[in-house]
Structures are given as structure tokens and as C-alpha cells.
């Protein structure tokens, strides 16, 4: 199982939202085909075919748990990563 698959599984499980590294969340979004633009400490991800814009910011080296949940909901809603 690749690192990406492990990260995707961790995000989809919903049990490790507090322990997801920001760089790992970025890796998953990049692999899912999201485009990123940066404005200050805000990383704004968009993808053709999705209505939502994902706006994430790091807290230290971790991703904010509520933002991991938002990413999970978008992955599930659009059936990405499978």
C-alpha cells in the first residue's frame, strides 16, 4: 500500500482528523487533481467538476481537523480517489 493510499484511508476513516499533517493533506489534494493557489497562509484548492472551493491553513505542521472533515466530505460527495 502506497503512502498516498494510507493517507487517503486515514482521511476517509475520520478517526485521525487531529493527526493529519498539513503536507499530507496537500499531497492527497494534489494527487486527486486539485489546483492550488496560495494567498498568505491560505491554500485554496479548486477542481473542475466540483462546486466547492477548499480553503485550508496549517496550524503548526498539522491540518485543522474541521478542514480534514471538509476534504473528506468532498471526496465522498464526488467519489474521488477510487
Regions found by a protein language model. Name each.
Residues 42-44:
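Major-groove recognition helix of helix-turn-helix-like DNA-binding domains
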Amino acid at each position: 500500500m502506497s503512502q498516498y493510499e494510507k493517507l487517503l484511508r486515514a482521511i476517509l476513516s475520520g478517526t485521525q482528523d487531529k493527526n493529519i499533517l498539513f503536507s499530507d493533506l496537500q499531497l492527497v489534494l494534489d494527487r486527486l487533481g486539485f489546483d492550488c493557489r496560495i494567498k498568505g497562509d491560505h491554500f485554496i484548492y479548486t477542481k473542475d467538476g466540483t462546486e466547492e472551493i477548499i480553503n485550508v491553513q496549517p496550524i503548526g505542521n498539522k491540518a485543522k481537523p474541521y478542514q480534514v472533515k471538509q476534504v473528506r466530505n468532498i471526496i465522498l460527495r464526488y467519489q474521488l480517489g477510487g
